[in-house]
């Protein structure tokens, strides 16, 4: 793209319409001073809207109209400039600006692109599409180089800001900050309402807790009262039921006892009479004979049992012997049967052997006779044998010749068939190979398409990874920048807090201040600094804590030891330390309900849970009372403090009076003191930074995971692409292999064709020769058959056949005889073994029979003994029965009746005593029941509540008294606080949800601002680095020296300016302000060229930028422009000879007689 044509109508010194054609490359405009050279560049600025009237050397836009037009007195005069760009060889793009000025001095200015009206902003948007920027340096006028030299460092840095697009980011940041201010304003309004609701909620919470506690106590008292009524009624009813049951039971028992006493008396009288009678009968009879007979009978019974056991054992042994004998006899019979069978088989085999021996002898004689006959016939047929042998040899020779031929014929036929079959196989293989080639070609096409698709996927993944890495880098840079700001703000806050801490009087004595200012790790603060109290209870709690408010709380005892060592070393006095790791855990405080008592002092202090052991140590079980009068009732029982500051000890000591504490330690109030606006501002910014860092850390983790995932996906895609590429290469190799196989198949087919032709030729020859050989062989066989048909030969053959048959018969007979002999030997050995077994079995049977006879004798003896014992037992039992019938019955009755009589007497006495005791108890119970019946029970609640079984009536009465005292102590109570607290809590929750949404929105906006800030820094840094590199290169070309751009504040470029540092050849390093005029111009031009190279445009226009340079520097500048003109169109206004000589063409400008500027063009390349 370049400027193809410039058309001016009544513009400044150009009267009428002047068309100036332009070409690509390097063009110089030259002419006398005041001829209107610079007006051409002003026309470009005017048409493209790149400068105002001041930039075009006019006070007002109407001054741009040619003066000859204004002097003619027309009501409206007009000037028009058209710039035509060549986009390519055929396409043009025109920009036209018209300025119409009225006689009154008013004017209108319009723009048109390709004859279509547009606004200036629309024109600039289209120009930017062609890399022509209003803030760029496409047109460098006479004053631009001078202004570059004279401008301050900040303005020079702002040039790079414009090129880097910093203004766009500033605009986005400003918009985000406006939205942030709106969000903050809403959040502040909500915070005010939140604080009011929190205060209201806290107040209502305390009142609600008090009301709920009062309500719970009241409900508990009502429940206990119901329990008391139920327990009283239950006790009354249970006592009545119990007495009635006892009375009824006793009455029934008394009736039964009376009946039993009468019955027992009658039974004892009858038993005494019977016992007396039995005693007289027993004395009349003797007992010694009875005892002797019993002993004899027992002895006989023992002998009988012993004999019976022996008899059972003998019987068992007899059964075993009988079984063994039966088994032996059965085995003996089986062995006898086997012996008879073997004897019969042996006799039969001996009978069969005799005929076999006779047959073998006869066969041997016949065989010898046949052998003699064969020998005689062989001598007579010698001549026949010779002729037969010759015929046989000839037949063999023909067969020897014919068989290889037949074999060869078969081989050739088979070879021909194989070759034809092989040809068919090769044809099929070639067909299959063509199919494989087609499939392989399809696979190659598919693989190539897949590779192309994977390459596109790789490109997409690489772009996504680059974008993700860029986002991660931006997030990381933002995170590091905010971290640096956080550290800076934290240091600033520490300094502010240190100054604020210096004016606070909450650090106790010198020792405490020294410890707190030493920054020892683990020092948590004074007791007074760790708790907050309400103003109402502050005096009482400070009096109760006393000097312990100045104790120093530390994390553990090692910190306390280090602090004590510091006090010793600095000689700063003494202090008490409370290490958290050694303080005893607080014990639960028992519920207290005393008149005038507010609560335990420990419960009135607000502190973090970790400091519970500290404040339990400070206050212990101290109680806070409303007044001294209420506390005096419990003097000596508790440690108490009143709201006015009186202290009552358990020992009875009382401390009180007036007190002034100008410098004592104080508890913190419920609301912390207001901080200064500066501290609050720093603290708010730290909070924002902390939220932003947390959010950035989350985003960095997420982005890092995305980068890792994309890297993994890209690596896998690369691996898949390599696999697919390898597969494609393998397919290509397979295709090459198939091509080689196809060539090999063609070669084999050609070879098989040759082999088949040769085999068929040889086969034809053999098929002609074989019939001749077969005919000759047939003739020889006929002659041999005729020879063999002679009578002598037939007789010899018959005898020979008989001999062979007889030899077979003889051999079979000899084998049969040998088998019979072998069987006879086996039978003899079996028979001998069986005879030995029979003998052993017979001996065993005899032994068992002997043992059986002995057992029968023993059994007979035992039977005799048992019979004798049975007779004796029978006689003894008869004697005992006789005595027993006379004595045993009477004696047993006597003993039994005597025992029964004693038991009856004992039972009667016991029953009589129980009867008397029960009568007394029954009288007492009847009196108690009469008394209970006269008492009426109180009304009971419905339904009846369940009372714990472990609680007695006295326990419930004590609980009711304690609950009544606690309720009286808690009055008055706001019972509406319960409902009001819930409503306030709901409103606060809804408001906090809105605040959470606003906080998230604010964090998002802050993060967006910080990201824009990071992009702003990155964009500036990229532009600065590129322009600095361009400046170094260009300055080295123009001045034979070196130079660079220097930021005044590299850490924060926007906080400082930009300096041009140059080192001309042969001179020390200098800043721009200390250079000469020519050096300044060269340095400024180097900077302008660096800016142009950073943001290249299709054309550049310079207006006498070489006016302050000497000849040598003009030559360098001209050479630089000549080199740059290869990439862009350069239009330079100059009067210097080196510049004109370096140009490709020159446009001459002069002032005509009619005061209009005229131009003429000259192509310098046509004049070498």
Curated annotation (Swiss-Prot):
Composition-biased stretches (Low complexity): 330-349
Compartments (UniProt record): Cytoplasm
Region (Disordered): 330-351, 652-679
GO cellular component: chromosome; cytoplasm
Keyword ATP-binding: yes
UniProt keyword list: ATP-binding, Coiled coil, Cytoplasm, DNA-binding, Nucleotide-binding
Annotated residues for binding of ATP: 32-39
Cell wall biogenesis/degradation listed as a keyword: no
Assembly: Homodimer.
HAMAP family referenced in this protein's UniProt entry, alphabetically: Smc_prok
Role according to the record: Required for chromosome condensation and partitioning.
Protein name: Chromosome partition protein Smc
Organism listed in the record: Thermosynechococcus vestitus (strain NIES-2133 / IAM M-273 / BP-1)
Gene designation per UniProt: smc
């Amino acid at each position: 793209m370049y400027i193809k044509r410039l058309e001016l109508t009544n513009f400044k010194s150009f009267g009428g319409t002047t068309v100036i054609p332009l070409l690509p490359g390097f063009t110089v405009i030259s002419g006398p001073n005041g001829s209107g050279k610079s007006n051409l560049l002003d026309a470009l600025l005017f048409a493209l809207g790149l400068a105002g009237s001041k930039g075009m050397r006019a006070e007002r836009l109407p001054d741009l109209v040619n003066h000859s037009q204004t002097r003619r007195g027309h009501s409206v005069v007009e000037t028009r400039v058209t710039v035509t760009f060549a986009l390519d060889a055929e396409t043009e793009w025109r920009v036209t600006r018209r300025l119409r000025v009225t006689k009154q001095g008013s004017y209108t200015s319009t723009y048109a692109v390709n004859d279509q009206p547009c606004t200036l902003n629309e024109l600039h948007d289209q120009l930017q599409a062609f890399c022509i920027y209003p803030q760029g340096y496409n047109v460098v006028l006479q004053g631009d180089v001078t202004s570059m030299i004279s401008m301050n460092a900040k303005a020079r840095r702002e040039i790079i800001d414009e090129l880097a697009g910093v203004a766009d980011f500033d605009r986005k940041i400003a918009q985000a900050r406006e939205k942030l201010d709106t969000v903050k304003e809403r959040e502040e309004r909500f915070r005010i309402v939140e604080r009011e609701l929190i205060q209201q909620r806290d107040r209502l919470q305390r009142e609600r807790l008090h009301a709920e506690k009062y309500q719970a106590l009241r409900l508990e008292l009502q429940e206990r009262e119901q329990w008391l009524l139920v327990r009283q009624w239950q006790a009354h009813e249970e006592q009545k039921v119990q007495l009635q049951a006892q009375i009824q039971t006793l009455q029934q028992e008394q009736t039964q006892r009376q009946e039993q006493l009468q019955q027992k008396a009658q039974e004892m009288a009858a038993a005494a009479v019977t016992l007396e009678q039995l005693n007289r009968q027993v004395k009349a009879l003797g007992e010694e004979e009875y005892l002797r007979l019993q002993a004899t009978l027992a002895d006989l019974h023992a002998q009988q049992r012993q004999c019976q056991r022996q008899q059972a054992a003998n019987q068992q042994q007899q059964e075993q012997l009988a079984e063994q004998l039966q088994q032996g006899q059965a085995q003996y019979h089986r062995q006898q049967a086997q012996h008879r069978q073997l004897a019969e088989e042996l006799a039969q085999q001996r009978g069969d052997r005799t005929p076999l021996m006779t047959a073998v002898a006869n066969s041997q004689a016949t065989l010898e006779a046949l052998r003699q006959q064969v020998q005689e016939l062989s001598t007579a047929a010698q001549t026949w044998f010779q002729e037969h042998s010759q015929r046989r040899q000839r037949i063999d020779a023909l067969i020897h010749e014919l068989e290889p031929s037949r074999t060869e014929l078969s081989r050739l036929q088979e070879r021909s068939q194989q070759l034809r079959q092989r040809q068919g196989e090769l044809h099929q293989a070639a067909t299959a190979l063509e199919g494989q080639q087609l499939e392989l070609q399809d696979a190659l096409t598919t693989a190539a398409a897949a590779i192309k698709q994977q390459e596109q996927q790789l490109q997409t993944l690489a772009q996504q990874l680059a974008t993700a890495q860029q986002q991660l880098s931006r997030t990381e840079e933002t995170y590091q920048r905010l971290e640096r700001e956080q550290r800076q703000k934290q240091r600033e806050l520490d300094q502010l807090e240190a100054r604020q801490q210096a004016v606070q009087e909450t650090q106790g004595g010198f020792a405490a201040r020294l410890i707190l200012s030493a920054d020892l790790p683990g020092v948590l603060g004074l007791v007074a600094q760790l708790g907050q109290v309400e103003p109402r209870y502050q005096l009482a709690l400070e009096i109760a804590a006393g000097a312990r408010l100045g104790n120093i709380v530390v994390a553990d005892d090692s910190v306390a030891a280090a602090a004590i060592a510091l006090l010793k070393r600095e000689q700063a006095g003494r202090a008490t330390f409370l290490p958290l790791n050694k303080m005893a855990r607080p014990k639960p405080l028992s519920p207290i309900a005393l008149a005038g008592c507010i609560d335990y002092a420990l419960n009135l202090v607000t502190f973090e849970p970790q400091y519970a052991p500290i404040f339990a140590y400070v206050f212990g079980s101290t109680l806070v009372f409303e007044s001294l009068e209420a506390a005096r009732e419990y003097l000596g029982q508790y440690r108490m403090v009143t709201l006015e500051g009186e202290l009552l000890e358990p020992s009875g000591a009382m401390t009180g009076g007036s007190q002034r504490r100008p410098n004592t330690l104080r508890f913190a109030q419920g609301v912390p003191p207001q901080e200064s606006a500066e501290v609050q501002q720093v603290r708010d910014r730290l909070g924002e930074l902390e939220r932003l860092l947390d959010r950035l850390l989350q985003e960095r983790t997420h982005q890092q995971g995305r980068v890792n995932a994309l890297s993994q996906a890209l690596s896998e895609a690369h691996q898949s692409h390599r696999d697919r590429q390898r597969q494609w290469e393998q397919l290509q190799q397979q295709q090459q292999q198939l091509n080689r196989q196809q060539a090999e198949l063609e070669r084999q087919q050609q070879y098989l064709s040759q082999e088949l032709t040769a085999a068929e030729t040889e086969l034809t020859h053999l098929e002609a020769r074989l019939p001749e050989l077969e005919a000759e062989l047939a003739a020889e066989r006929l002659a041999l058959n005729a020879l063999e048909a002679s009578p002598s030969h037939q007789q010899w053959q018959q005898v020979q056949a008989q001999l062979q048959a007889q030899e077979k018969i003889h051999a079979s007979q000899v084998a049969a005889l040998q088998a019979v002999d072998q069987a006879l030997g086996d039978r003899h050995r079996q028979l001998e073994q069986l005879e030995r077994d029979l003998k052993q079995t017979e001996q065993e049977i005899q032994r068992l029979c002997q043992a059986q006879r002995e057992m029968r004798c023993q059994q007979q003896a035992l039977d005799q003994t048992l019979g004798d014992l049975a007779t004796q037992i029978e006689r003894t039992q008869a004697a005992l029965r006789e005595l027993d019938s006379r004595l045993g019955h009477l004696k047993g009755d006597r003993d039994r009746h005597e025992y029964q009589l004693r038991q009856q007497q004992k039972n009667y006495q016991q029953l009589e005593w129980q009867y008397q005791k029960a009568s007394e108890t029954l009288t007492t119970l009847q009196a108690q029941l009469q008394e209970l019946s006269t008492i009426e029970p109180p009304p009971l609640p419905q339904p009846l509540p369940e009372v714990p079984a472990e609680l007695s009536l006295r326990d419930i009465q004590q609980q009711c008294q304690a609950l009544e005292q606690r309720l009286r102590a808690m009055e008055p109570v706001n019972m509406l606080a319960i409902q009001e607290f819930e409503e306030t809590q709901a409103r606060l929750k809804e408001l906090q949800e809105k605040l959470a949404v606003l906080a998230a929105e604010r964090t998002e906006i802050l993060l967006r601002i910080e990201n824009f800030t990071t992009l702003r820094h990155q964009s500036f840094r990229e532009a600065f680095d590129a322009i600095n590199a361009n400046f170094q290169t260009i300055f080295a070309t123009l001045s034979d020296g070196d130079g660079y751009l220097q930021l005044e504040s590299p850490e924060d470029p926007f906080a400082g300016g930009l300096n041009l540092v140059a080192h001309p050849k042969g001179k020390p390093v200098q800043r721009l302000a200390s250079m000469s005029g020519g050096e300044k111009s060269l340095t400024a031009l180097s900077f302008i060229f660096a800016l142009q190279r950073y943001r290249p445009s299709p054309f550049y226009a310079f207006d006498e930028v070489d006016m302050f340079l000497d000849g040598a520097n003009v030559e360098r500048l001209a050479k630089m422009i000549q080199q740059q003109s290869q990439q862009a169109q350069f239009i330079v206004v100059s009067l210097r000879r080196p510049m004109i000589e370096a140009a490709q063409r020159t446009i001459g400008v002069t002032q005509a007689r009619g005061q209009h500027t005229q131009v003429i063009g000259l192509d310098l390349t046509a004049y070498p």
